[in-house]
């Protein structure tokens, strides 16, 4: 899998920094971070990335407006999920997931699964 540009949408700064480190360690390029829905949607509209790691819970809100926009633009994303998360809406049920807590191996696996999903779609 060639190096990709990855946008990280995560509301916890330390987790976002850890994901940036993991992404770089795996040969990819962090394309930036966003920690809330409004900033994330602005980043999505600007573009400049190949893939998104998207935290399901962003503060008191869920990520579905962002996931909807990414899907409309055919931009692949991985849903980062923590403990008490409800099932995603049906239109995002097949999105690759990355369960918390993250490890380098689980991030690698999620990125590889996202690549496989893209090939299946394309």
Residue ranges and their predicted role:
Residues 59:
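The feature encodes the CheY-like receiver
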Residues 33-51:
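Acidic, metal-coordinating helix/loop segments flanking the phosphotransfer/catalytic sites
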Residues 55:
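Active-site residues of response regulator receiver
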Residues 13-32:
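Two-component/phosphorelay signaling modules centered on CheY-like receiver
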Residues 78-81:
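Hydrophobic/aromatic residues positioned on beta-strands within the core alpha/beta folds
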Residues 65, 72, 83-100, 109, ...:
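Alpha4 helix (beta4-alpha4-beta5 surface) of REC/receiver domains from two-component response regulators
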Residues 10:
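Conserved acidic carboxylate
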Residues 102-122:
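C-terminal output helix
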């Amino acid at each position: 899998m060639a190096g990709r540009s990855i946008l990280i949408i995560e509301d916890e700064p330390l987790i976002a920094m850890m994901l940036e480190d993991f992404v770089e360690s795996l040969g990819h390029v962090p394309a930036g971070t966003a920690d809330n829905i409004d900033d994330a949607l602005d980043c999505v509209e600007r573009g400049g990335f190949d893939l998104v790691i998207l935290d399901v819970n962003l503060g008191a809100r869920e990520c579905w407006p962002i996931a909807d926009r990414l899907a409309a633009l055919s931009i692949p994303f991985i849903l980062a999920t923590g403990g008490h998360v409800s099932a995603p809406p049906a239109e995002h049920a097949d999105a690759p997931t990355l369960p918390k807590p993250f490890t380098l191996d689980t991030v690698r696996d999620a990125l590889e699964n996202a690549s496989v999903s893209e090939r299946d779609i394309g």
